[in-house]
Amino acid sequence: MINDASLPLAFEPGDWSLPSARKVAIVSLILTEATLFSIVVAAYVFYIGKSLTGPTPREVLETPIISTICLLGSSVTIMLAERALRRENQGRFQLWWMITILLAAFFLGATALEWHRLITVHHLTIRTNLFGTTFYSLVGLHASHVIVGLCLLTLVLVSSLRGLVTAKQHERIQMVSWYWHFVDAVWVVVFTVVYVIGR
């Protein structure tokens, strides 16, 4: 007979715990949003090349290289901000967080300028053709998430400047960071589908 006391335990009490409610909530939100984006991306891919009238993506789209670099770079800066907060370095946290906000704002500004050019110069609206409908739906959906993220980033910065953000609130800041990484990751998919495959 095997002595149960001699068997190694897979884990000891206290070695693990359930994730916090915040983490469960943000992961659930991200999964839900990912499903929504998947549907819209699939619709965009399905309708590629099916517009009966112009303009076409090849005729009017310009690849947003600089704004894409800025948005993806914001994932690096927010990661550096998180690290600074864990080390209780408020100055560096605020600096990197502010840079993240500026990069996000630049991306939104570039998107707005692109839309202005498409509408005023090329007369591409959401009603022009299937390309216009799917383009504004997909890019607009992503832009709306960037706006939400930018509002959250700004709220955190204001709270930090008022002395309300410390290392004790790191998990809350991490949740904002997770959301922002998700927004950036989605843009990689949108960029690939719209500006690479779709052209």
Annotate each predicted stretch with a short phrase:
Residues 1-199:
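...captures the hydrophobic TM-helix bundle architecture rather than a specific catalytic motif
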